[in-house]
Structures are given as structure tokens and as C-alpha cells.
């Protein structure tokens, strides 16, 4: 069994960096997760910090921010709220559950409201 695993690693079939890159790409583009949630899930799979960081570097910053804004706009149309503060709280909880950073969330919510 060890020989088989060693052979797979040598032939680049088992590659942590490639896995991290594919995982990041899929979760970001398909599920529209943020960096925090992606990092947490990769850590649960015991992927090294180096591989995680290399995978996360592949996310285009402009596309990342566009995803954040698109998610907020879509959710904003779908939720019902008693007042402005309730709406903002629901939007913030939703987008943070997707794994986006607090600072980016605050900036995006400010832009959405103003």
C-alpha cells in the first residue's frame, strides 16, 4: 500500500497543491464561497497552509468582489425585513456564512445602502 501511494505521489496523481487549487476554484466559482469558508474546509481536510495559500492566490480579486456584490444584491431582493437595520443584519449574517471577510462585507453593505 505504501509503495502504491509513493508511486502515485511521484507521478503527480496525488498532489496536495493541485487538490487545493481545484477545491478553491470549484467552491469559489460554483458555490460562491469566500476565502474564510474555503480555508476552513481545506484545513478540515488537513491540507497544508502553503497549499491553501497557493490555491487562494488563484482567486481574482475583481471577480471575488463581484461575487460578493452579486450575492448581496440577489439576497437583498429575496429577503423581507421589518426595517433597514433588520435587513442589514440578515444580509450580513448571510454573506458571512458564505465565508467573506468582515471588512469587505461592511464596505459592500455600505455601497448597497448608499
Regions found by a protein language model. Give the residues of each.
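An alpha-helical, amphipathic repeat domain used for nucleic-acid recognition
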Residues: 1-114
